Amino acid sequence: MNRRPFWPSFWRLARPYFVSEDRRAAWALLASITALSLAIIWVNVQLNTWNGAFFNSLQDRKFDDFQRLLVQFAGWAVLYIVLAVYQLYLNQMLQMRWRRWLTDHFVRQWLADAAHYRLSLADFGTDNPDQRIAEDFREFVDDTLALFFGLLSSTVSFLAFVGILWTLSGPITLAGVTVPGYMVWVAIGYAFAGSVLAHRVGRPLIGLNFRQQRYEADFRFSLVRARENAEGIALYRGEAGELEGFRARFGRVVGNWWQIMLAQKRFTWFSSFYGQLAIVFPFLVAAPRYFSGAIQLGGLMQIGNAFGEVQKALSWFVDAYVRLASWRASIERLDGFIDAVERARLLGAGLTVREGDVIAFDTVRVDVPLCAQTDADAVETADDARAVAAAGAVPANGVVATRPLVAAGGERIEPGRHTLVSGPSGCGKSTLFRVLAGIWPFGEGECTGPRRDAALFMPQNPYLPVDSLRAALLYPHAPEGVDDARLREVLAQVRLDDFTGRLDESANWALRMSPGEQQRLAIARALLQRPRWLFLDEATSALDEDTERAMYALLRDDLEATTLVSIAHRPSVAAYHVQRLAVTPRAGGPASLALRPL
């Protein structure tokens, strides 16, 4: 769990929206809901007075007063309903506006400076960012508003009804000592005892709720991973292993849920007893005055109602305890998530990548986190990232224990000089691409990479959004502005003729297309975007050699102003390059770079 004090963590999450560009609407809605809440309390005070008169009319058998009071009640009821409906409506409006702003604000931070990628490279003490963004922000907003307005209503209700209860209850003499407004002191003592006991009984729920969200997210992530890799699991016949993994993860969900059930069972024993006793308790305490004739039935009912309002206001902590536990857990999770994003963005301070028209490695040293997995090129998936995370938690200053991977010494790639990057698996070739892309944070020194708007990086497994084929072709740009005829032409060039009539079809193309088709779609993207620099990280590994040669010839001939920089293992690819950047591992030290003609 996060170790930051609770209230600074809360303020860090709550303040930004109310000073944002949407602050006027936020404060207007907050003020309106507050006004409606106060108006509802005022109606409750009027109904308390009505309550006394109504029951007195019953006791005195005054039918005319009875009829008149029923008409009054109808008016108060209509007013109460209108106020309650609009209070709920405006509350939900504020919930959605606040959640929308929070989600957009923190998703932008998560995506900025490749923080979302860097979070996968080391253990920052957080997990499942999708859970944090999709669910915890919703819970934070909903719980904050519910608790704020609940506390506000309880405070104002106490102030409104404590005077009524003081006046109606009168004094009581015990052992020769007269206690004025004795019902007020009884209500305070009753609520105080309940609050202390509620905290003692319900405290374990805070940690249990925190862990439950984590276990649920881990289980859901494993299901998504299985769905995305269904073919591989089926081919390996790994269903039995997956089932065991699912059972183990869901077992943690169930085990923690049992603990929550037991904790909530204990708390419900207490809260139910406390709530049921509160119904009859004021009448038991006030009964002597009623039977002595000091008050009428209406006065007794007013006392019961006022005591209930005061006791309910003072028992806010008891009634809201479960929600408070969930609220605190969500704030701790979100604060840890924001800390992790900020620390991830701090990484890379020692590695400077300038933008220019050439690639120059100067005196850069590229590092990799210390962990069991030494193949930096294999950090592609969530599972691989978890292996890298074995390096240990990232301290608050964002420093990660690393080892040198590649050391450069002034190698330069000039525009127009198609370059093949070669070397054994795991020596750091893909990591060099990540450095040039500006997303790899581990290392020291300076190097020059292409301008971001002039470069396109093509990984071995291209990303295909779940969207139309048109959007997948033009990713990451908006799917407008390119003529359909041009899109069909490019698809035909990369031998995807069967897809030319499906531009507006939406699908999960990563499942609909074979790996080779996906790689050819990525090549089609390059033909459309026409970058000055094109980096291919085994981007044709799923193609047969004839198709691979055809694709490289197409790139070379069609993109005359583009410099190709390729990582590939097939010797045939060398024919489409003029020089080789060799990455050579060295025993006991980082790999070296050497640029040679082909």
Task: Give the residues covered by each predicted segment.
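ABC-family ATPase nucleotide-binding domain "signature/switch" substructure
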Residues: 472, 504-598
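Helix-to-loop junction immediately C-terminal to a conserved catalytic motif
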Residues: 437
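Primarily ABC-family ATPase nucleotide-binding module
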Residues: 125-126, 338-420, 446-451, 489, ...
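Cytosolic ends of transmembrane helices, especially the final helix of ABC transmembrane type-1 domains
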Residues: 206, 217, 232-238, 281-282, ...
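Conserved "ABC signature" C-loop
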Residues: 462-511
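A hydrophobic transmembrane-helix motif
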Residues: 35, 39, 48, 79, ...
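Membrane-integrated ABC transporters
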Residues: 1-44, 53-73, 87, 91, ...
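An intracellular "coupling" helix at the cytosolic face of ABC transporter transmembrane type-1 domains
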Residues: 137-142, 208-228, 234-281, 323-326, ...
